[in-house]
Every structure is written in structure tokens, then in C-alpha cells.
UniProtKB/Swiss-Prot annotation:
This is Probable Fe(2+)-trafficking protein. Belongs to the Fe(2+)-trafficking protein family. It comes from the Bacteria. Could be a mediator in iron transactions between iron acquisition and iron-requiring processes, such as synthesis and/or repair of Fe-S clusters in biosynthetic enzymes. InterPro entries: Fe_traffick_prot_YggX, Fe_traffick_prot_YggX_sf. Keywords: Iron. GO terms for molecular function: iron ion binding. It comes from Haemophilus influenzae (strain ATCC 51907 / DSM 11121 / KW20 / Rd).
């Protein structure tokens, strides 16, 4: 049976992650309160950020920037701003 969490991003009950994907206290918070769907949406944004800003995950400052963007996106309701990106209209 799938594990459910109250997703802070979606603001509703949803299927939770299968295991902790991120280390430390933040990883535990993500595991406890972010759904698979929300994590998938974050991964898309993360990929765009890494590519557009040419982030290098070997660089501690770049990792810190990406982590802050992740917290803003998943827990504070702030969308990721990517220069020149216009989301498709439905």
C-alpha cells in the first residue's frame, strides 16, 4: 500500500515518496511532507535551473543556491524564475 502525506506544496493528501531522497533534516522534512507529484515538479524546475544558470554541483555555492530554490518552491510557494522562460499556456 502506498504511503500518503499531507503535501505542503499541493496542500492536500497525496502519495508520498518511497524513501528519503535528500540528506539531513531537510531531507526528512521533504520525505515527511512532499508528495511524489510535487517532487517530480521540483525535479523539472531543478533541471531547468541547472541548465540555464550553468550550475556546477561540485561548487558549494551553487548547491546552496539550488537548495534555497528547492525550499522556496516546495515549502514557501515561490515559483522558480528562469530568465526568458515562458510556461506553456493551456
Amino acid at each position: 500500500m502506498a504511503r500518503t502525506v499531507f503535501c505542503e506544496y499541493l496542500k492536500k493528501e497525496a502519495e508520498g515518496l518511497d524513501f528519503q531522497l535528500y540528506p539531513g533534516e531537510l531531507g526528512k522534512r521533504i520525505f515527511d511532507s512532499v508528495s511524489k507529484q510535487a517532487w517530480g515538479e521540483w525535479i523539472k524546475k531543478q533541471t531547468m535551473l541547472v541548465n540555464e544558470k550553468k550550475l556546477n554541483m561540485m561548487n558549494a555555492e551553487h548547491r546552496k543556491l539550488l537548495e534555497q530554490e528547492m525550499v522556496n518552491f516546495l515549502f514557501e510557494g515561490k515559483d522558480v524564475h528562469i530568465e526568458g522562460y515562458v510556461p506553456p499556456s493551456n
